């Protein structure tokens, strides 16, 4: 378990296991809160800007991002789907979105 939430300036995980590797959020100076990261490195949350535009060296599913077709923004990857059908909350529009089989497109669920 990697949890760098106690260090707001940590920008990478050099020396971490191969599947974690090197991560760098280019849109802000700090990438934090990698709770639950070691297995296949899915949960990422940049607490400074809430926008993961570029994660150099991140796994493909992270680099692709999670795009909300409702507000046209990339959603936070905190609580990102671990399997098809898991719900995610888009911080851009507060809608709930759900992955389809390619893990990059979503069905929109307006909570109102």
What are these regions (language model features)?
Residues 1-9, 17-30, 38-51, 57-73, ...:
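Concave beta-strand-loop units of leucine-rich repeat
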